[in-house]
Amino acid sequence: MNTAIVALPPTLDPMFWIGPEGFFAAAMLPATLVIIFVETGLLFPLLPGESLLFTGGLLATKGTIDIWVLSPSVAVVAVLGDQIGYLIGRRIGPALFKKENSRFFKQHYVTESHAFFEKHGRWTIILARFLPFMRTFTPVIAGLSYMSYPLYLGFDIVGGILWGGGVTVAGYFLGNVPFVRQNLEKIILGILFVSLLPALIAAWHGYRSQSRTAKSELALPD
């Protein structure tokens, strides 16, 4: 019995765009580093951190990115981004507790990160690396709490190496597993879809909220 394997159309195949010969192949490394910096340093928590690094590791098995360039580069950029977050915490940290919710910022991001920091102390700097949202706001909380900067920097470097290096290398080694290697395109599509869900859901909720507000204002009598 013959089993037909349906290939993805070229434009739906992620390798068409981000493979070694893909249209955006040369942009993968700088784009990854920019996204990681924005997530960690500019307080934008909805970017797909882990999934992006894991995908980068998978792509390294195809030759799109050199894993031994990607891993240390991500670790360095993540640590640099965190220094911005720490500085923000030192300078304007208290104001974040008064900031109103918006499409991409929720007050509970800050309060939950603060509670986590209070519970785990200095180890939060490492643990929060692996927790979405918290890795964005933990540097701010550390700065707000006036944690000793040399101590913070030491823990942050360890966390950056474990997260930036660990997740990418894990993706690289998993990408060499025969089953994963044979289905790499579909796996990357799945990762991209899942990683974009939080941003899509947040955008949808923001749109619904604005629509309800607009309808309420129209319903008010003159």
Swiss-Prot record:
How does the protein's chain sit in the membrane according to the entry?
Multi-pass membrane protein
Instruction: List locations, semicolon-separated.
Output: Cell membrane
**Which InterPro entries has this protein been placed in?**
DedA-like, VTT_dom
Q: Where are the transmembrane segments?
A: 23-43, 67-87, 157-177, 187-207
User: What GO cellular-component annotations does this UniProt entry give?
Assistant: plasma membrane
Quick one: where is this thing mainly located? membrane
Alphabetic keyword roster: Cell membrane, Membrane, Transmembrane, Transmembrane helix
Q: Name one Pfam family in it.
A: VTT_dom
Regarding protein family, the annotation reads: Belongs to the DedA family.
What is the designated name of this protein? Uncharacterized membrane protein ML0287
Species the sequence originates in: Mycobacterium leprae (strain TN)
